[in-house]
């Protein structure tokens, strides 16, 4: 359940399960009492989970807990962290914990293990910007180590084999934590791609995964493999599963995860009902119990896989029934209706829903756009024709009585009654209602 969690991570795992209301009442009570017992041992009760721990345990109010705190916590209770840093993590004062870690002077032989701990804290508080910086630094470190190996063999021989190996293992674990970061961000393609790139470039990757991942008391081997499994199933197109499962470079990894191979084979053979029994059964249980898997699983991963199969049926069918899909896939009818309707609307797919039936519409989205543009064009042309007619009528009026709109009314009347050919400029100005001082119409 807690994958051997120690230190602050134990409280995080217990608090997570209680927060999502997971488990039976007696289980939850037992977890809560275990959490409170740990808090008393490390002399720290300032955790955001304290209220729910007390509520689920049925123990005394929060204010009475501190009276039981005595002695100094044993280092084994701190999860490899300094006492003050462990308390900061328990209190969710993550930024202060990271600051303290970054401010410490660390022996050269422990620098990568130290960076490993900083990466763990950054993951707990989802400081993905900080993790990006760590990823950049790790790339430079790895490149520097390669150059060092090529140019400085004497120095390499001087350093003990154990130190070199510990550094290599720490760097690989940090890179695995980067995969965890991608998963938490729901970047499933990046998660599995990063891991498979590690496998091809770092021969020790699978050794560290199988033998040296659990030792950091953060994420278990089973949880990490499940992250990769889910990322593969979601990211790789349905049509490419058949090629993927036979990749020779991944043969060793497939041996570590028969569950993934089984799922791929079921999907390749379109045995979706059996696949979803595993997806909603064994895989769902593992994810819901995990601090690192549950958030992305509940937020997107579970439904993305279902939508992937819905889309497969839409692609090969012109007419579908919700009830048929429900019985074929073994998924609740109401869930299918809600998810498939959202898929059609958000994807602007050419399907129309009529009760229990989904029909394919022959007209494409492009054709709908063309039709709309054509209708708009007709309306615009009608407006233009109307304006043209109004302008023509106005022109006819002006041409029929051109002097009606010249100057003032009196001037127009006078000029209209007498021929302008018989007048000179002075005479016209004399007859105008507008004086010279006002700038007469015919002033020279």
Swiss-Prot record:
Protein's UniProt keywords contain Nucleus: yes
Keywords for the protein's UniProt record, in alphabetical order: Cytoplasm, Nucleus, Signalosome
PANTHER family reported for this sequence: 26S PROTESOME SUBUNIT 6, COP9 SIGNALOSOME COMPLEX SUBUNIT 1
Main subcellular location: cytoplasm
Location within or outside the cell: Cytoplasm; Nucleus
Domain PCI: 195-367
Keyword Nucleus: yes
SUBUNIT field: Component of a COP9 signalosome-like (CSN) complex, composed of RRI1/CSN5, CSN9, RRI2/CSN10, PCI8/CSN11, CSN12 and CSI1. Interacts with PRT1 and RPG1, 2 subunits of the core complex of translation initiation factor 3 (eIF3).
Function: Component of the COP9 signalosome (CSN) complex that acts as an regulator of the ubiquitin (Ubl) conjugation pathway by mediating the deneddylation of the cullin subunit of SCF-type E3 ubiquitin-protein ligase complexes The CSN complex is involved in the regulation of the mating pheromone response. PCI8 may also be involved in transcriptional and translational control.
GO BP annotations listed: adaptation of signaling pathway by response to pheromone involved in conjugation with cellular fusion; protein deneddylation; regulation of protein neddylation
Region (Disordered): 419-439
Any further remark recorded for this protein: Present with 504 molecules/cell in log phase SD medium.
Name listed for the protein in its UniProt record: Cop9 signalosome complex subunit 11
Cellular component, GO annotation: COP9 signalosome; cytoplasm; nucleus
